[in-house]
Every structure is written in C-alpha cells, then in structure tokens.
C-alpha cells in the first residue's frame, strides 16, 4: 500500500508494510529516501526532516489503513511533531476528531533541536507555531518541546525523574515547561522482559539457577567468566560488573577518580560497553595495570551482558542522572546486587539495604561524590564477606531478587 505525502515544498512517496506477529498488527512506514541504509539515525539535520516526514506520514496513513486509534503514543523527539500536526491540521478532519496523544520522554537531554527557519520550511507549519510558548526555544526549533506542549498527556519513565525534570539541574532548559505541564505529567517506571532475562532458562549464561539453587549454582558463572576473561579464577573474589554506554551521564567520572581504590586485591571489576574515547581508554589503562582484576571489554555483546549479570556479585550504576535505567532491573533478576546513585529510576527501583531491619534489594548513595560511592561499595563488600546471613546474599534473597 502506498500514497503521496506533501512535505513543505516537495511530495514524497509513502509506503506501508504490514506484519502480524503474535496476534498484533504492526505497520511500517516505507521510504527509501529517508529510511534507506543500515542505521536508524544519521546527522541531526537529516533526521529533523526524516522524522517530520515520518510524523506526517504516520498520521496520513491512518484513514487509508482504516485504523482509527483512541490514543497515539509518541516517544521522544523523533515523534514530537505528531501531537503538533494532530492538533494543527489533522484534527479538522472528521476521522481524527477525538484522537488523543501521549508524549513519553525517555531522556530529556535529547530534544531534536535545529535552525528555526529551516524547520519552518521542512514542516510547513505556520509562523504562530514557532513562538516561545510552542516550538521555539532559545531561537531554535525544538521537536520535543512541541510534543510536550501539544500532547494531551506527558509521561516519563520513573516517578522520581518526573519530579527531577521540573528542576533546573535536570530540566535541560525545559524545566519551566515541565512545571507548567505538571498537571498532565506522570512517571511510569520501565520494566524488562522476564522471559528474556531468566537465569533458570537463559541459554546465554554458563550455568542456570533459580531461587532454590541460587546459593549452590550462581558462583559457577563467576568462575566461568573469570576463565573466559583471563581473570584470577577464585570464587571468593568480590566481582563488580558495569554494563553501560561509556558517557558522562553514567557517572564514570566518579569511577575514574577512585578506580585505584576500587581495584583492591579482593575485588574484580568487569566492564562491558562503548562510548566516549576518554572512558574507553581509562578502562583499557586499568585493564593493563590490574590485568588479573580488571577486564575492560570495549564493545557490546548481548551474550556477554547476560554473562556479566549472572556472574557478578554486585552491579555498579553511579549515574549523574538516570531517567529509569534497565541494567539494575536485569542485575536484580539474576540475583546480582545493584549499587546505585539515588537518582531517577534507580531511586525508584532499588531499595537500599537497612542492616537494622534486614530489608533492601541493593545499596545506594545520594550525592554525586566519588568517595561517597567508594564508601558504599566498600560497605557492600563488607556485607558480602562478613554478614552472609543478611538478606542480600542468601537464598532467601533470591525470592526478592530473581523473582522481582
């Protein structure tokens, strides 16, 4: 199925592919000019036009398909124009009347910002849409801002992040707008696929285990990973994992500041991920310096990530900010205790251990401070070695951790 779509001064082909999978029908917008190639994203100036086309094409295709949704759920700046187009143009048609939109923000840092004059030309929107209370922001056009302004509801991926983005520190220059739209803003925490991340059936890990066999079987994954990565093979080592994009958002400046102290003789540190060159080289350096304790795997592998979740004793996420985070949920699923900074979804999903009440699913620290992080890592290590009867490292914990 195909049609033609006007985009400012040009007319573009719109193809629609249909797939039914597990009883759900999926529609895909096709256009080789915009979507040819092997990467979903390109340069920002190209993506600005690509996603303007996509937003308009998706709305235009609905009556052709005979599919009238009650709600259109938009995700991030790439679909930020859908609520704008829906109210500016499409809602005038009988077919579209009553359709509502929801705008979900996964990370407020990414907003789809480009030159205002060029965006006017690309989108075909009239001048009145490019004012400071609509799409204009600091003399540029901002797709995400448009979506937030025009959507009927706005959500983000955790309750704490929904509150944080109303403040200047986390608000990415949109905190005033988030406060203004707070009456329609909600935080809904992310989740993971419990079938995909299941230590009892996961074919990617070395040794399967469940709530009952947790104590007897999990450590075998540690020894197997030590062997594969060339680390000292010793089940008594306290193994910390870090699977992440290597960017400043992830709190890696804290790790860099105290890495020598983290690499104590009884600790092993396994890193998996790619990102900024300075962090990649930092971890490579410590891999060279402590080659029996540190393994820097500067690539990404789904198979290896599962092995790290299953093998480690603790999982480190000291993020500067974290809208939700999924890795802490994955580590919990494998009975690997998260050590996190209390921000965004990390605060919402990890209950800090209370030694007096014997409750908690992980360890946390509040301030963005390297020595505060180091202190909580050492506390987690002390609990691991000297308080084996505590909730976190017993098979009783498996009911809370693996059975999240």
Write out the residue ranges for each language-model feature.
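Conserved small/polar residues in nucleotide/adenosyl-binding loops
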Residues: 1-5, 393-401
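Catalytic binding pocket for nucleotide-activated donors in carbohydrate/polymer assembly enzymes
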Residues: 307-310, 314-391
């Amino acid at each position: 199925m195909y049609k033609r779509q006007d985009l400012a001064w040009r007319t573009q082909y719109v193809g629609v592919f249909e797939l039914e999978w597990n009883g759900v029908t999926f529609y895909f917008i096709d256009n080789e000019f915009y979507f040819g190639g092997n990467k979903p994203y390109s340069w920002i100036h190209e993506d600005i036009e690509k996603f303007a086309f996509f937003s308009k094409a998706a709305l235009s295709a609905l009556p052709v398909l005979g599919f009238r949704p009650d709600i259109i759920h938009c995700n991030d700046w790439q679909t930020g124009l859908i609520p704008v187009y829906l109210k500016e143009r499409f809602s005038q048609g009988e077919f579209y009347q009553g359709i509502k939109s929801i705008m979900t923000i996964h990370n407020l840092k990414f907003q789809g910002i480009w030159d205002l004059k060029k965006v006017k030309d690309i989108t075909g929107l009239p001048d009145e849409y490019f004012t400071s209370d609509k799409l204009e922001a600091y003399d540029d056009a901002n797709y995400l801002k448009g979506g937030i302004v025009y959507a009927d509801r706005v959500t983000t991926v955790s309750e704490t992040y929904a509150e944080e983005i109303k403040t200047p520190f986390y608000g990415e220059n949109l905190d005033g707008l988030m406060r203004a739209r707070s009456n329609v803003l909600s935080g809904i925490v992310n989740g993971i696929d419990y079938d995909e991340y299941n230590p009892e059936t996961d074919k990617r890990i070395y040794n399967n285990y469940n709530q009952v066999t947790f104590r007897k079987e999990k450590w075998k994954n540690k020894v197997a990973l030590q062997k594969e990565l060339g680390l000292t093979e010793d089940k008594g080592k306290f193994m910390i994992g870090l699977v992440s994009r290597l960017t400043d958002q992830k709190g890696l400046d804290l790790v860099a500041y105290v890495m020598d102290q983290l690499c104590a003789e009884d600790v092993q540190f396994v890193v998996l991920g790619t990102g900024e060159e300075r962090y990649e080289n930092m971890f490579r350096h410590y891999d060279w310096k402590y080659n029996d304790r540190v393994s820097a795997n500067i690539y990404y592998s789904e198979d290896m990530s599962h092995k790290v979740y299953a093998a480690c004793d603790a999982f480190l996420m000291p993020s500067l900010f974290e809208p939700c985070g999924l890795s802490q949920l994955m580590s919990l699923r494998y009975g690997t205790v998260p050590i996190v900074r209390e921000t965004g979804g990390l605060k919402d999903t990890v209950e800090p251990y209370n030694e007096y009440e014997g409750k908690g699913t992980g360890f946390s620290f509040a301030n963005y401070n390297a020595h505060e992080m180091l202190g909580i890592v050492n506390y987690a290590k002390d609990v691991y070695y000297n308080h084996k009867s505590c909730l976190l490292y017993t098979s009783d914990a498996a009911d809370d951790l693996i059975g999240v």
